Amino acid sequence: MIKKIVASTLLIIALCCAPFTLFAQGAKCTISGKVIDQQQAPVAYASVAIYQDTRPIAGVVTNNEGKFSLQANLSTTEHRIAVEFIGYEKYEGFIVPNKAHIDLGTILLKEAAVEVAEVVVTGKEVAQKSTVEHTTINASANMTSSKGTAIDVLRSASSVSISNDEIAIRGNKNILVLMDGVPTTASDLSTIPAANIQSIEVITNPDASHDAGGTGGIINIISKRNRAEGFSGMVAANYGFNHFANGNIALSYNRPKTSWRFSYNVKYEDDVVNSTLNRKVHSTGYAVFQQMQSTRYTFNNNISLGADFRIDPRNRLSVDAKMIIPRLNIKQDLHNTFADHTEVRYNDVTWNRVNVEGSVAYTHIIKPDVSDITLRASVSKIWGERPSHYFVGGIENNRSVSGGSPFIPSLQADYKRKFSIGTLSAGAKLTYRQNDVYHEFYELTNGEWIYSDKMSKDMLHTELTPAAYAMFSSRIGKKFTYKVGLRGEFSTTTLNSKHDAINERENDFFVAPSLSGTYKVAENQDLSLALSRRIGRPTYPQLIPYMSMVDATTYEQGNMHLNPEKATKVDLSYNLRTEVVNLFVNGYLNYTTDYISQVTKMDGERLITTYANADKDLKTGVELSLKITLAKWFNFTAGANTYYVTTKGVFEGAHIDNSGWTNNSNMMLNFTPWKGGDIQLQYFVTTPQYYPQLTTSLTHQMNIGIKQRFFKGAMTVSVLLTDALNTAKWEVWSHNNLFDLKNNSKNKSRMLWLGVSYNFNSFKQRGGQKTENDRSLIRLGM
């Protein structure tokens, strides 16, 4: 009943804006069709409207069978037809009403990635939605996201584990990061504010249309876009006690033909991390107990600009530019206790970066609702520098300066064509990746700074990857749909180092097939299967060859000679949807060869943490998502990911072995006890995780948030307590053939946050226009 009232109200609003000539007499064209969802079920009470330019001229809602019929005056000009329903992506097509009857057949509505809707007071937002291929996380459904970064948004996905700000999908850290679907050099997700994020897609089993990179999967960050007509905006500020603050402003101006958007975000933090470390090397008997206090100063600025141009009903152009300017300074006080002496050290390390992103996308609709082509171009560039100073006993005895300039441009073309038997998608992409790295290390000798040739390094790495794909999707009968695809990528990699006299070139061809299918067991139940092949090319932190000093005997260094890892992925899922319960269960198997792993080896008396290719890595597990809506004022969401991992390999005498069971779970309770108010309780727990040579300990934390809306939802005030029980920590231990280790650290995780945001004009609609936010008012599910 509520759906019917909402749909009818939206339709009445749209038609009230149509001129009275709508009812003029004349020859008519009858347009009919049927609206269905991805499960082939009819969509009742969907609104269907016909537009001439931007003016609505006719409209109707679908009946219980999803069918509709409406009339428009006969015309030789092109008209736009729009079909909308809450929780689904808007469908748009074009027709020419030049005959007595036009049958549009079936119109498919796809479930929408939920838009951010901070001021909506008539319903609840969907926290996340899962399929056999991916999970979509709604950023604003999580209260902790308002003060945080992309990492805070990702915590709510059980497939994602976060340890010491390192991200893994189902235990694999080799992840491809995209911004609005295009490659980015901004792999540090802690620099991307959640205030700018609409949603994040965690793609665990990508099809052939996606880049084959990232054996762990793909994280696609989708930026906010306000589609309300006219001028609107939002300002927000959050303060965490003590010394954590961030602010955000977002503006948009939308007209029928153009849209403009701007956002700016600033963040300041000074965090204190206290750590202890016990380590003993078997071969030398060397043992140390280390106490360290690190103060982390973070100052980030993010600016984004964008515009959309609806040139005509068949042609659209989008332009976006982003600039991320992160500044990070870490000051470390270390107290080392050895068997025969003690040592006091002090490190001062600064990261300065400027990251620029730009993209252009052009879409041409060749034939409405039949074929289209999209062209995309993007560029991502970082200018980075890292000056470091190392002190012993209050005297600086080492210093270094290093930097790099990762650069990723790409060109892409995608074509889609619908046939009576199915849909064909095809495309081509050209991606170039380059990083020019230098590291200069100096030692104080007899009062003079002497360049260390042994500790200094350089590297120029390039990678050119042309790719092409084709994919076909269709159905067999009324209950089974499938999608089959094939992608080929040919990469040419060069590696140059003047210091090490290296000049290498390597070619590699990788074939990435994909297959997925869904069988509709019942009206509200599905079984799905997905298979794919992936390749994980080494990331720049894994490749960079220079040594970074941790202490007098411990260093970190990349490995220029890593091979790509290759993975086979299989997923089988079951989905049940009712008005009260939404259940998603997914079993998976990931088998990876040449698995890229972090490993610590001996180099004389030094321990060097680097990266190496293990022989193989196998992960098999079950992922579960559950949402229960017991009442309008209360719902419960839970997620769990349990898997068994085993890794095998040897690198320069170090065993790259480990195995064990791991569980990553989360729970969220949502209450709406009064009008405009929300109370949210979150609980996260991660059991020990098993990595080659290392095992992390169990960790858990609880967050509690309260949010209240004022002035008809335009203003929101929030109070948030993170890690209420003060249990969040990072602890790792190891007992291997080279050394024993136990390391733990604790930062300012329990914090009280106060936040306020104000939206102006964001949801004042003109005429019959409807924003994307309307879709999330009633829709339930994951």
Question: Predicted segment positions?
Answer:
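Short, acidic, small-residue-rich periplasmic hinge/interaction motif at the N-terminus
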Residues: I36, A49, E84-E89, I102-M143, ...
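Short, acidic Ser/Thr/Gly-rich low-complexity loop/linker segments typical of extracellular
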Residues: D53-K67
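N-terminal periplasmic accessory domains that precede
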Residues: D103-I107, A150-V153, S187, E201-V202, ...
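Extracytoplasmic beta-strand/coil segments of soluble accessory domains associated
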Residues: I151-P183
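Short acidic/polar hinge/loop motifs at secondary-structure boundaries
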Residues: V182-D207
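Face-selective signature of the C-terminal outer-membrane beta-barrel domain
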Residues: T258, N302-P326, V349-S497, K520, ...
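Outer membrane beta-barrel strand-and-loop segments of large Gram-negative receptors
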Residues: Q291, I408-Q412, D453-K457, N559, ...
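Surface-exposed extracellular loop regions of Gram-negative outer-membrane beta-barrel proteins
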Residues: W383-E385, T492-T494, Y519, E523-K569, ...
